[in-house]
Amino acid sequence: MPHSDELDAGDVLAVENLNIAFMQEQQKIAAVRNLSFSLQRGETLAIVGESGSGKSVTALALMRLLEQAGGLVQCDKMLLQRRSREVIELSEQSAAQMRHVRGADMAMIFQEPMTSLNPVFTVGEQIAESIRLHQNASREEAMVEAKRMLDQVRIPEAQTILSRYPHQLSGGMRQRVMIAMALSCRPAVLIADEPTTALDVTIQAQILQLIKVLQKEMSMGVIFITHDMGVVAEIADRVLVMYQGEAVETGSVEQIFHAPQHPYTRALLAAVPQLGAMKGLDYPRRFPLISLEHPAKQEPPIEQKTVVDGEPVLRVRNLVTRFPLRSGLLNRVTREVHAVEKVSFDLWPGETLSLVGESGSGKSTTGRALLRLVESQGGEIIFNGQRIDTLSPGKLQALRRDIQFIFQDPYASLDPRQTIGDSILEPLRVHGLLPGKEAAARVAWLLERVGLLPEHAWRYPHEFSGGQRQRICIARALALNPKVIIADEAVSALDVSIRGQIINLLLDLQRDFGIAYLFISHDMAVVERISHRVAVMYLGQIVEIGPRRAVFENPQHPYTRKLLAAVPVAEPSRQRPQRVLLSDDLPSNIHLRGEEVAAVSLQCVGPGHYVAQPQSEYAFMRR
């Protein structure tokens, strides 16, 4: 039934008194309470808040996707103006009617494109399916339109990408495919749920710019769900702040940033890591934590020196890691991915060395190669005077007691069939270190050390939040008293308060136990906060390395400056240079088998500060 007289002029969406609840052990648990908002055509509304505040379930309720998950949705009004300008009440639509609304009139970009795209269908088939369903196009017409959409989201070689599967694309490319699919039918409303959270800063900047360009072209209303206040400042017209299922403040982006009224909004803004906030400070600094009772305040810097003088605990020289690519009728290796090329660095006890760079720069492969989780083709890895790269499997297992790994996705790295107590105990059992009672006491101590309760040992991973699962992974990494921890994007997908808690925990553990961290991240503001030294990687090579202050306050390499310039700043009035939408993620690091890449030559430009020389820099950046 039409409701055209109930929408205010210019509005494309209006929600009044939305309530969402879930049944848990025969109890109704409220997720969202009395939420009301509107969205105008061509406007971007940012919905912000921490994990569990109700942002994503609100989006799913608008898309009518909560019913299958057992959600209980009640709303006085949920009106949408379709592309045809007809106004409908979403809550009154049948499942069959909603199939025609989703995609055509209201589309959604999900946070994780790998789980949102079907792995058994090509990219072209998935985009074309939506076009055929909503536009009554033939298969040939749908594929032509799918290619046009890939061109529109600046994907290079779109015709080739149409025939590829999701796993064959990078994270940034998959996210752009999701955007192309969502926009393929020119919807009236686009809901973007954390579309850039786990992406590196340059790809994030491209996607934000892309959404703004396409929004202007299509006069779309956009609901942008995020916990990143820098992104909010860059893209939003209005902001809705949610806390524990309720809207606590709403207003223009300038009002929210310059005159926040609610204590939670003020605490949220104060807790945002600001690039440049560490200027003039030599040592890492703890994050302020969010609290309604005590608004976030700056923690003092860690003044004591944690780095121990003497020999480095880890020494890497000319590390080379390549992956074969097979092709042809005989499936021979014809090309190789040069993931890591002649990388060298030292890591001292009590030091945090951060590896930064875009997706595909070789950061994670470097970390995995140090533990021989991937095999390297050259170079030396020396831990406490002993070469890791030549050890037998038995001796390597013993050495892994001293080097532990924290993975990006804690849920994927915990066995869902094991209690977390068993997961933490497993390294102790493998190395035969502690008998039963002592091991149980050790687990209880570790859980308390990472801010959890000893009785949590009997629970399973799915019973914890993302931040709690990451704490469990840290507890497991600490079980063997390691000397080195490799943290691979350990906080990239966590919201600002949980991220602050985890970083503070890592700093406390470093102070107490002298642990050295190799911190792999694309979040430059976090890297600035936690690091003693920083190494910048590009196409598998280190192009700049030095003390954190030198790299951040006086970056010498153009790629380092590019990374820093791409970081969103939580200041909406700041004038930003117009970005050029790049046509690809990174130049290719795929070469013919046997082809050697010129090693970058580093030049000293300050105490401990080394930068790629211009001539060698050109040799690899031109590819």
UniProtKB/Swiss-Prot annotation:
Q: Provide a Gene Ontology MF annotation, just one.
A: ATP binding
Topological category with respect to the lipid bilayer: Peripheral membrane protein
Q: Name one GO biological process term.
A: peptide transport
Q: Which UniProt keywords apply?
A: ATP-binding, Cell inner membrane, Cell membrane, Hydrolase, Membrane, Nucleotide-binding, Repeat, Translocase, Transport
How is this protein organized at the quaternary level?
Answer: The complex is composed of two ATP-binding proteins (GsiA), two transmembrane proteins (GsiC and GsiD) and a solute-binding protein (GsiB).
Reactions that this protein is recorded to catalyse = glutathione(out) + ATP + H2O = glutathione(in) + ADP + phosphate + H(+)
Sequence ranges assigned to domain ABC transporter in this UniProt record: 15-269, 314-564
SUPFAM superfamilies in UniProt: P-loop containing nucleoside triphosphate hydrolases
Which residues are involved in binding ATP? Answer: 49-56, 357-364
> Where does it mainly reside?
membrane
Q: Which Gene Ontology terms of cellular component type are present? A: plasma membrane
Cleaved signal peptide residues: none
What organism, scientifically named, is this protein from? Escherichia coli O6:K15:H31 (strain 536 / UPEC)
Keyword Transport found: yes
Task: Tell me its family.
Answer: Belongs to the ABC transporter superfamily. Glutathione importer (TC 3.A.1.5.11) family.
Biological role stated in the UniProt entry: Part of the ABC transporter complex GsiABCD involved in glutathione import. Responsible for energy coupling to the transport system.
Its EC number is 7.4.2.10
Q: Any idea where this protein resides?
A: Cell inner membrane
Q: Which domain of life is it from?
A: Bacteria
Name the record gives this protein: Glutathione import ATP-binding protein GsiA
Tell me which InterPro entries the record gives: AAA+_ATPase, ABC_transp_ATP-bind, ABC_transporter-like_ATP-bd, ABC_transporter-like_CS, Oligopep_ABC_C, P-loop_NTPase
Which is an annotated Pfam family here? ABC_tran
